A protein has these predicted regions:
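Short alpha-helical segment of the dimerization/phosphotransfer core of two-component systems
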Residues: 3-8
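Conserved catalytic submotifs in the C-terminal HATPase_c
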Residues: 29-34, 51, 56-66
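Short alpha-helical segment within the cytosolic histidine kinase core of two-component systems
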Residues: 40-52
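Short helix-loop "hinge" at the ATP-lid/N-box region of the Bergerat-fold HATPase_c
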Residues: 85-86
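Acidic ATP/Mg2+-coordinating residue in the GHKL
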Residues: 112
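Short conserved segment of the HATPase_c
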Residues: 117-129
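Conserved glycine-rich
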Residues: 156-161
Length: 177
């Protein structure tokens, strides 16, 4: 359980990141990077939380996939989705990551067997400060998915979600060149 100070620090940092991205103070610097390495960095960030809940994170990828991405900001975007997957998946659940290659882009699917997102809320979840009804009582401020979409869009990519009562799949479409 987070202390009040930790929650306030998290909120402040999230607001600063959002403000800097929106105002253009920080610009993304895409360069040829390994998506695999970015994913592994994000997994390391949420690993302790997943372990606490006995959640298994799977990412079996024998091929290295490269794309024009800002390493740190893309890791931030993936971490936001992974953090939500761990947060909304019950103990003993599974969070999976899979990369699929297409001619001009890579698709990263992040799936979970969590509580799911009602269909009527799916179009709203990327809005600033939006929190769904099912997130009541679960820590969060409604900035993570908003930031994630902004980060991915600024790199000429996009994000989609498919969800039902058995879990969610967030798909990030990332330009290779």
């Amino acid at each position: 359980m987070q202390t009040s100070l930790e929650k306030l620090t998290f909120l402040t940092n999230s607001l600063i990141k959002m403000s800097r991205l929106e105002s253009g103070i920080i610009s993304l610097k895409p360069e040829k990077n390994s998506l695999n390495d970015i994913v592994l960095q994000a997994v390391k960030t949420v690993y302790a939380k997943a372990k606490e809940k006995n959640i298994t994170i799977t990412f079996d990828c024998e091929q290295n996939f490269e794309a024009m991405l800002d390493f740190n900001w893309t890791a931030e975007a993936i971490t936001n989705i992974l953090d939500n997957a761990v947060k909304y998946t019950p103990s003993g659940g599974i969070v999976g990551l899979e990369i699929t290659e297409y001619p001009s882009y890579l698709r990263l699917d992040i799936s979970d067997n969590g509580i799911g997102i009602p269909e009527e809320e799916q179009a709203k979840i990327f809005g600033r400060f939006y929190r769904g009804k099912q997130s009541a009582g679960i820590d969060g401020v409604g900035i993570g998915l908003y930031l994630t979409r902004d980060i991915i869009n600024k790199q000429k990519g996009y994000i989609k979600v498919a969800s039902d009562e058995n879990g969610s799949v967030f798909s990030l479409f990332l330009k290779k060149d």
